[in-house]
Amino acid sequence: MTVLEFKQDTPEIKRRSGRISPRNILYATDFSATSESALPHAAALCRRFGSTLHVVHVLSDTSLLLMTGGVDQVSFEVLYDDAQTLATGKLKRVSDGLGKIPNRSYVRHGKVWTNLSTIIAENDIDLIVIGTHGRTGFGKLLLGSVAEDILRHAPCPVLSVGPKVCGRTKLQEFVGTGSELSPVELELRHIVYATNLTAASQTVAPVAIALAKQFEARLTLIHVIENYSQLEIAPGPIESGVRQLQALVPKDAALAYVPEIVVECGPASDCIVNAAIKRDADLIVLGARPADGTTHLPFSTVHRVVAHATCPVLTVPA
């Protein structure tokens, strides 16, 4: 249920400088169709911003032990050598398919997040791109918790490409791997920024605003009230939500379009996803707090948004 919605379609606000331009993008893959679906988006970002793409595959002890069935150490070492050779070959094909995009490939062994965090720190990674599925977890990017670790602890923004994102077709990079996906182009025409209006909003909202400015995109700011049983008697939270959303956009933001302010009542994930679908949004922006492992929105909400969104979801540390 939409409680309040303010929108103006005139594109006459003056544009000013202010850009987001990641220099180093990390794309994590386990070579499943789930993770491979994010590669076209990582490549599109690199083409747009002139970024270097860091392609990472981690051979985890857990996955290798499952493959060996608990056999002796010699067999484990042979399997590891074979797995590393296979992974190196796949990464070489990915690299060759990236054409003129500057790229580096990594095969690591051990705990996934430990290896990723090291690569992130050593290479000043500005953005992480992952593919996810919508069942019980965040994809086969290793056995259950890896994508969650990334979203909770990444020191930089994370772009998640969920199972309902359009354009998950075939791409030349993966010819011969059974999952060829076609290129996509980075075109942001409408961005939806969802917030629960905590203090973190003041550090995350500028990212959505900067992207809207840079791409001359429409921007919708949405706040969802999940506990709305008393709103007819005391509508204060609605009015407060509108004022706080409006305050997130500086008066001198100089966007191409006047931002749309929306306050809705209902399940947060449903309202956010439906708002993005209604506007044919190209990106949803959410906040995350890596320091204490909690999300700006509840993690279950973030998960459901990623699982059901028809566009990529950008989570930003706050």
Predicted region positions:
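Structural beta-alpha unit
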Residues: 1-21, 34, 41, 93-128, ...
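Small/aliphatic-rich secondary-structure junction motif
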Residues: 6, 10-74, 181-235, 308
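General small-molecule cofactor/ligand-binding pocket signal
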Residues: 54-56, 104-108, 159, 220-222, ...
